Amino acid sequence: ETTIAVLKNPKHDILSTLKGPDFPGGGFLFYNETELQKIYDTGRGSVTVRAKWNYNKQDNCLEVTEIPYSTTIEAIKDKIVDCIKQGKLREVSYVRDETDIDGLKIAIDLKRGSDPEKVMQKLFRMTPLQDNYSCNFNILVGGAPRVMGVREILEEWSAFRLECVRRRLVFDLQKKQEKLHLLLG
């Protein structure tokens, strides 16, 4: 959608159609328009990604269902266990990986009387459940690396695709001309 809009109007506001990165592991992206605009313009910057979670009142546990792209379940579990051992997380009694066919899930059991919101804020501060993801759009153009913004990347990609289509058409035309030459004798 953004590529088509930029092709139609080179001055198109990219932020209006390209809202932000979409990570395979999911997570919640803190939307900072100025930082995102800087990344889109220069190809450098960072965004803050936070895990998605909910509170299971029946089991008195926090369920993390999406994690930042730059971390793993094991790293999160290890850091939580370290914090529990150091006495920094007295509200947490146990952490386990309940990932199955339904998807990712880290269950964090809370002690009675713990406030889930406050515990999650602590977890975001002390573990990889919240992380900064650095962007560096380093692209090879003509065999040389360049850092480019999104608009430049889209323009380079469009030019590359146009050249690919042109070369394919020239190749097909040559094959058809050779076949025509053989048929005509």
Annotate each predicted stretch with a short phrase.
Residues E1-G185:
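C-terminal interaction appendages of subunits in large macromolecular complexes
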